[in-house]
């Protein structure tokens, strides 16, 4: 058993002791879970640098997660199901997406999950999250890297909403990825005007590893400085060799092993009663992490037991992410790299640009441990350039076969996050949209997905068939064709068709297969993209259409342009 301790920090009545129907009151158990894994066990072999991490006297590698478990006070009153909330950049998001907590200003919201008897555990897994009262942290082991030869590189993506001269060496406000040498002449800074645009180098003399302080500009291993300033609307990539090498992939082992722990008898389990089914929920970043976990086949624990019975992979698109390579930054998603690599679809196929034959479920099929999976996406993941590749051939105009264990759903006419009233044009990162944001609230569909997933995993009741843009029925269309159609219907500003994002084949060097990359990645041929077609009102026709689209009051545009970009 990989979980060796559950250090309970606090137990309290959840929601001030509110009772949730037949399931009664719930407890909230806050604590820290300690894991210890065998780096030589076959089920852990895919974790990059795990064998370079420190071990105890038994040869095991240790790491810890901050957790919070919400479960019925009387364990006999629950539904014997556990939802694992794979927190997004340290933040629990499951309650906002299933309990609609924003409408009630409380974590329990309208109580959907708890009224159905679900237990929920929120789990920290990301090495660079700075833990506090809100954020869930993770203590990862650090690998001892041979300082001779090529160690690998990382890349910091810099996008600003205003001119700034300094930027933290992290993706968002995380623990800085400090460089091994702040005077490294091989460190590189590049700039481009849009994601798929041409790239140019910024001369090394124009920037430095430094910070602007009250005493002036001073050398720093936590910041990058450029006198002319990083400009809004531009995309910068800074690559260098870091001084620290966290074993980032242990976060995925924590996600796997917390599930198997709660399905097994254990004397360190704070509720001392196994769950019958465990389902994972990830959104955006953590949805990509779920896809990466599936790809690596991480659904059997060290004793050979199945961890997850099902997953809801929400707004992840067709990518994976920076979750299992040396110097990875899990919050990074848009810079070309390991997360943009083939395969994109569940079933095995050949990469049209290489000899690689692979599928997301290949490793899981080898060990007979494929869980039930719901992929739920908004229109944004299609316009991002990658989502269609999970079900449409990447260079041929034909639909791909679906995996029998999965369902794929587009929530038509929606943006990345569920819409709310009243509409706004300022995003959580401070970016300003050209128009008010989409208000379609797709969360009822997430609730239905959970109910259907549970029935499927429990008694084999088949869920509704997949619903997404297809070539064979004309609901899938190239973005540039769609933009022209919109221009003929609506008098609005639309994206430049030449600047719509596409995923490209990437190359991180000769050791990329070991999880050790040269960055920024070299980019080559593009994989094509499709989006949903539209009707005469410019509303999407592919996927599941909410009443906002079928009982028409307005057009719900899916792409979101940012001012100044």
Stretch-by-stretch model annotation:
Residues 320-420, 446-451, 455-456:
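Extended catalytic-interface subdomain
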Residues 44-47, 93-99, 131-138, 267-268, ...:
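Short, solvent-exposed loop/turn and secondary-structure capping segments
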């Amino acid at each position: 058993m990989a979980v060796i301790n559950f250090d309970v920090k606090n137990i309290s009545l959840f929601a001030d002791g509110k009772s949730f129907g037949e399931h009664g009151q719930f407890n909230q158990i806050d604590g820290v879970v300690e894991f210890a894994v065998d780096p030589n066990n076959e089920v852990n072999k895919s974790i990059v640098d795990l064998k370079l991490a420190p071990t105890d006297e038994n040869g095991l590698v240790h790491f810890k997660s901050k957790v919070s478990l919400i479960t019925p006070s009387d364990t006999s009153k629950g539904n014997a199901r556990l939802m694992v909330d794979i927190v997004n950049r340290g933040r629990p998001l499951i309650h906002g997406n299933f309990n609609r907590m924003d409408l009630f200003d409380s974590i329990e919201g309208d109580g959907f999950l708890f009224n159905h008897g679900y237990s929920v555990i929120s789990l920290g897994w990301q090495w660079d999250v700075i833990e506090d009262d809100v954020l869930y942290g993770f203590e990862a082991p650090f690998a001892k890297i041979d300082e001779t030869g090529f160690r690998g590189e990382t890349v910091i993506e810099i996008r600003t909403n205003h001119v700034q001269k300094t930027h933290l060496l992290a993706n968002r406000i995380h623990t800085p990825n400090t460089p091994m040498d702040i005077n490294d002449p091989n460190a590189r800074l590049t700039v481009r005007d849009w994601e798929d645009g041409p790239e140019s180098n910024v001369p090394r003399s124009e920037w430095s590893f430094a910070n602007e302080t009250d005493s002036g500009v001073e050398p720093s291993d936590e910041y990058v400085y450029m006198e002319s300033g990083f400009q809004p609307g531009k995309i910068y990539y800074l690559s260098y060799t870091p001084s620290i090498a966290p074993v980032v992939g242990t976060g995925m082992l924590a996600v796997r092993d917390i599930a198997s722990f709660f399905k097994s008898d254990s004397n360190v389990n704070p509720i001392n009663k196994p769950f019958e089914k465990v389902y994972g929920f990830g959104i955006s970043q953590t949805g990509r992490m779920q896809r990466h976990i599936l790809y690596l086949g991480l659904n059997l624990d060290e004793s050979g037991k199945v961890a997850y019975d099902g997953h809801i992979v929400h707004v992840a698109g067709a990518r994976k992410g920076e979750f299992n390579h040396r110097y990875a930054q899990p919050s990074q998603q848009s810079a070309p790299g390991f997360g943009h690599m083939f395969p994109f679809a569940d079933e095995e196929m050949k990469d049209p640009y290489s000899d690689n034959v692979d599928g997301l479920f290949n490793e899981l099929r080898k060990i007979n441990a494929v869980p039930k999976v719901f992929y739920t996406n908004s229109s944004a993941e299609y316009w991002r350039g990658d989502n269609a590749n999970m079900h449409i051939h990447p260079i041929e105009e034909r639909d791909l076969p679906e995996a029998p264990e999965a369902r794929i759903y587009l929530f038509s006419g929606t943006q990345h996050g569920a819409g709310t009233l009243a509409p706004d044009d300022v995003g959580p990162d401070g970016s300003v949209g050209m128009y008010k944001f989409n208000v379609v609230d797709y969360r009822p569909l997430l609730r239905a997905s959970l109910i259907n997933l549970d029935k499927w995993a429990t008694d084999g009741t088949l869920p509704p068939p997949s619903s997404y843009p297809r070539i064979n029925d004309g609901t899938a269309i190239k973005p540039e064709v769609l933009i022209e159609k919109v221009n003929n219907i609506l008098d609005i500003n639309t994206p430049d068709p030449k600047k719509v994002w596409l995923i490209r084949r990437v190359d991180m060097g000769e050791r990329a297969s070991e999880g050790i990359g040269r960055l920024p990645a070299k980019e080559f041929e593009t994989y094509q993209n499709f989006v949903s077609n539209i009707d005469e009102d410019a509303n999407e026709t592919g996927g599941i259409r909410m009443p906002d689209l079928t009982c028409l009051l307005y057009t719900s545009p899916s792409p979101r342009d940012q001012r100044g970009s």
